[in-house]
């Protein structure tokens, strides 16, 4: 038998946008993201598995961005002090070479979220503003020049009456970009004015935004809303999270490392998925609350007949395929190899044989989903720590949301 020679300089780039992406162990990427969110809120041990399924698939920066989004949506209002710790740990991660010590930082952050209280306030405010038309009962917000002279009395009304939905709509959708800082100044001064200043926290929101490198306008608006809701939360008899931080030992990381075949011990590639896929993608039936990529494709056909193609869009699989000079064939949804040697060597290492797996294994990734939950039920489940009480018609009207 010959040997596959590296000719990577001649390989066509894999740059077409796919309908789905398979991860390291052939879960659908967007579903791993959503299951991670819900498992963290449910305080489940499986949270760590889903976090590392994304992380070790090569989506390292995306995992950090997702955890920031989760933090601002669900945790910031009750745990504002965690912000600086999060910044510190991400900075450490960015300066370290790839080691287990570096990788365990994700474990530390997720573990810290699991022990902290959370609510749905910011998340629901964002979703309602995104999915419904909120009438602010005025058209002057279209004129940014009128901000200083007209808006302030309206803001006073909103803040004094705790009209969180109008505040959110203004921050997220109506406020002009060049007026965001001015509105933040107004909010800051409001909470520094007696009697509010006796209970609120002196956190500099602008400083927090500046600490988050490469913050775009959407994230900036998200942070501002979370900051305002945190200050309102301080005015209520709600228990805030404690400054506790989890220590993670390297020995705890072994279970999340990528599993490879080992012919010497007769552990062949087709044995990887049954061992590695520890959890089903939707054990708690939350996924039907969201818009999913699987709705745009024949998922079973993709999994059984074209998994290599859809996996090639994950960095870990892209690098594996590139090592054996594979090229994505976008027309046939296959991976083409330049010769039999490259083909054989790739499959000697990674022939997962999805079409031969037991249903128990394949269903971990491509199970049929059951529509059992509504957002109104999720709100009832997590409303204890929140201060925002959405109108019932909003909760009933929320269907499949895009996160």
Identify the meaning behind each predicted range.
Residues 4-36:
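Long, low-complexity, highly charged intrinsically disordered regions
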Residues 31-37, 43-53:
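Conserved helicase/translocase motor-coupling segment
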Residues 24-25, 45-49, 55-403:
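C-terminal alpha-helical interaction modules of replication/initiation AAA+ assemblies
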């Amino acid at each position: 038998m010959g040997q596959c020679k590296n000719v990577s300089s001649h390989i066509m780039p894999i740059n077409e946008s796919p309908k789905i992406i398979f991860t390291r162990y052939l879960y659908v990427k967007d579903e791993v993201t959503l299951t991670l969110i819900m498992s963290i809120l449910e305080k489940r041990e499986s949270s760590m598995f889903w976090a590392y399924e994304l992380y070790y698939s090569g989506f390292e920066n995306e995992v950090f961005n997702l955890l920031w989004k989760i933090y601002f949506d669900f945790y910031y209002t009750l745990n504002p002090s965690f912000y600086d710790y999060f910044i510190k740990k991400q900075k450490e991660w960015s300066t370290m070479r790839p080691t287990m010590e570096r990788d365990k930082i994700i474990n530390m952050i997720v573990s810290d979220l699991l022990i902290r209280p959370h609510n749905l306030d910011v998340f629901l405010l964002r979703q309602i503003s995104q999915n419904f038309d909120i009438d602010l009962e005025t058209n002057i917000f279209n004129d940014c020049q009128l901000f200083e002279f007209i808006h302030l009395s309206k803001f006073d009304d909103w803040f004094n009456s705790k009209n969180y939905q109008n505040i959110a709509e203004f921050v997220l959708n109506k406020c002009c970009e060049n007026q965001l800082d001015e509105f933040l100044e107004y909010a800051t001064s409001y909470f520094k004015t007696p009697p509010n200043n006796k209970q609120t926290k002196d956190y500099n929101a602008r400083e927090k935004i500046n600490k988050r490198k490469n913050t775009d306008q959407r994230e900036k608006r998200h942070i501002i809303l979370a900051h305002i809701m945190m200050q309102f939360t301080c005015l209520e008899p709600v228990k805030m999270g404690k400054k506790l931080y989890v220590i993670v030992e390297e020995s705890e990381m072994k279970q999340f490392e990528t599993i490879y075949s080992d012919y010497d011990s007769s552990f062949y590639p087709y044995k990887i998925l049954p061992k590695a896929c520890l959890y089903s993608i939707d054990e708690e039936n939350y996924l039907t609350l969201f818009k999913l990529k699987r709705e745009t494709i024949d998922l079973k056909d993709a999994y059984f007949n074209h998994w290599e193609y859809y996996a090639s869009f994950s960095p870990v699989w892209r690098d594996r395929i590139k090592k054996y000079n594979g090229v994505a064939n976008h027309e046939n949804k296959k991976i083409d190899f330049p010769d039999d040697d490259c083909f054989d060597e790739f499959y000697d290492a990674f022939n997962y044989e999805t079409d031969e797996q037991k249903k128990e294994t394949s269903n971990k990734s491509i199970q049929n989903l059951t529509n059992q939950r509504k957002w109104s039920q999720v709100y009832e489940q997590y409303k204890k720590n929140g201060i925002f009480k959405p109108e019932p018609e909003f909760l009933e009207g929320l269907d499949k949301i895009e996160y």
